Amino acid sequence: MKKLLYIASICIASLFSACDDYLTVESPDQLTSSSFWRNQSDAEAGLAAAYSQLYLMTYSGDMWSFPEIKWPVEAYREDIIQLGSDALNYPNWVELGNYTYTNGNSQFSYYWQCYYKGISFANQVIEKTAEIPDENIDAATREQLVNEGYFIRAYYHMQLLLNWKEIIVRDKYITDPAELSKPLSSREDAWNFIIEDLKRATSLPATRDADNVGRATSGSAYAYLGFAYLTRAYEEATNKDSYLASAIEAFNQVKGYELVNNFSTMFSGDNKNSKESIFEIQFSMSSANGATYRTQFHRWIGVSELGGWDEILPSQTLISEFKKEGETATTGRYDSRMYATLFFNCDYYNDGNGRVYGYDYNDWFDNKERVAFRKFMPSTYEGLNQNYSAINVPLMRYANVLLMKAEALNEQGHPEQAIPLINEVRSVHGDMPPMAGTSQEAVRAQIEHERMIEFPLENYRWYDLRRWGK
């Protein structure tokens, strides 16, 4: 993935020129979609362009757009989030927070455009890599790159389907303007398409070497395949049992991962691509070859007291959920995920050990009721004061697989099989004792609790609420 990061920005311009393929005259010294795909290097460059839309690059390719599109669309509608003071200055963000938005909302439009751009790039990878002469690419590499294209195409379609009622399935690279006009697909057809793409991607390598870490693997494909089946199980009651079984089967194939003991390190830049990470957006402070894979995300997440812009805050609902089980962790405090996720007024953050960037909470915050996100903030004072950060963003973690598998098992009527999976996450990440209760309803409630406090800012709550019909 390191190589892909550096070449992505170079090749995107070449692939954008494909928009002019409708013209009958081509410049002999300009790459187009018809002349670009010559060998393995070109195919890898095209794949890099497909990955690039994970960063939701718009605003002329500036990485400012990454937090300003992804989190307003995916997080502002969650009940565990509230808008910060500066966010209230942007009407299109406020619309998302108070549910008065329409499809004309600019953040929705950017989100839609960026992911369909990624789908177009992925379609080029799938179609054009297959046309590269055999002498310029070996068969195994060709197959792997095409299957990677299938994964990326499925991911973008799935994110769109999770956020809209209906989407347009784009199953081919468009070369004729007449093909742009296409009706919305049914959710059933969209799920069928996504699932088939993910099935193809399960043949990807199980692991990646250092130069390619962050690229999709078979584990990535199986994890999202299970997620797709689980979500679909709630939408199609007549096939619920079958989809739940398929979800569990997919989750069982997610192998070679473990939960990380130090929860906060996965979101501070200290433990990139950890043993728990299944699919993760890569960032780098390097600007070599014009790369811009760094962000000011820590400014966007951070509160004003910590030099941030005050765009996003935890809601009282989230704070109450963290405190729900009381100070019952083995540490004698609340669930350890609370301290890894939030800065708040408590003995832990005011014990004189400088746990908030070398100082106590009280040294930073005049308002003692103020609660701020720690998650996705740099771990050091030096990092806090840098203009840019390069903290990776996990999109799929093993904890998610365990909790989704527990959910599927419980919905099948096997709460006794779900409970050990829940307790594993509670113990490793929260230092919490085993859950109370053994009934299906108790397990349902516990899964919701665990997901609420496990994934803040990872943007699963809205999809959970939709899946559960809440």
Language-model region placement:
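C-terminal structured "cap/appendage" subdomains that terminate the fold
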Residues: 421-470
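Conserved, well-structured interaction surfaces
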Residues: 39, 44-48, 52-60, 84-164, ...
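Alpha-helix C-terminal capping/termination sites
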Residues: 159, 163, 231, 235-240, ...
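C-terminal substrate/ligand-recognition segments
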Residues: 109, 336-423
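C-terminal motif of bacterial Sec signal peptides marking the signal peptidase cleavage site
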Residues: 16-18
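Sec-dependent signal peptide recognition
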Residues: 2-9
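An aromatic- and glycine-enriched ligand-binding surface/loop that stacks and positions planar moieties
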Residues: 20-89, 167, 191, 198-200, ...
